[in-house]
């Protein structure tokens, strides 16, 4: 069952779902909570490696990832990040989210931004039960013009679903959880897959 706005407010009041900083009530509507863009970004260096062998040996994949990912880019207040057509970049939400073991979250982009070509998450929009940390956004500009993105702008909306029971393997308890407690735009850790 997806939570409605009054249930979301109740879960926040009871600290069953924790969003920090806590959204004001005008950011909670229908079945979602608006989230904002943080100030941490990463981009891909062009032509730093001819390809990434996703199923290659870990050492090779690690070396290729190291070549293609930029260092973390931290924007100052009011500064813009420009996402050019055809580019992929990583960023984070301003808010940190903590979910209990019996709730799954979903991130959706804003329709107004999608109509300009901005994809907020390329595929990974599920927030696992037991998650704690900022949400990494996988931005892609499918439009024709560069897009200026600024920290604190409304970027997406979270919704929440109650599971049939508590997850036996919540994210925060898994030893193989690669992005546990993330607070910045962490690049792919596919090389840590088992």
Swiss-Prot record:
Primary role: Catalyzes the deamination of dCTP to dUTP.
Residues that hold dCTP according to the record: 110-115, 128, 136-138, 171, 178, 182
Biological or metabolic pathway of the protein: Pyrimidine metabolism; dUMP biosynthesis; dUMP from dCTP (dUTP route): step 1/2
One Gene Ontology molecular-function label: nucleotide binding
Record's subunit section: Homotrimer.
Catalytic activity: dCTP + H2O + H(+) = dUTP + NH4(+)
Protein name: dCTP deaminase
């Amino acid at each position: 069952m997806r939570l409605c706005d009054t249930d979301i407010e109740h879960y926040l009041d009871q600290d069953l779902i924790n969003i920090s900083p806590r959204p004001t009530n005008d950011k909670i509507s229908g079945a979602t909570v608006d989230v904002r863009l943080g100030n941490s970004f990463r981009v891909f260096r062009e032509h730093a490696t001819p390809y990434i062998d996703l199923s290659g040996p870990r050492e090779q994949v690690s070396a290729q990832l190291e070549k293609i990912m930029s260092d973390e880019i931290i924007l100052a207040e009011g500064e813009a990040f420009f996402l050019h057509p055809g580019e992929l970049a990583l960023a984070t939400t301003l808010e940190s989210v903590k979910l209990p073991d019996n709730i799954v979250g979903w991130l959706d982009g804003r329709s107004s931004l999608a109509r300009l070509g901005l994809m907020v998450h390329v595929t990974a929009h599920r927030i696992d039960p037991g998650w704690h940390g900022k949400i990494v956004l996988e931005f892609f500009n499918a439009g024709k013009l560069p897009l200026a993105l600024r920290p604190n702008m409304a970027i997406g909306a979270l919704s929440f679903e109650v599971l049939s029971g508590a997850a036996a393997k919540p994210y925060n308890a898994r030893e193989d959880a690669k992005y546990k407690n993330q607070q910045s735009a962490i690049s792919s850790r596919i090389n840590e897959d088992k």
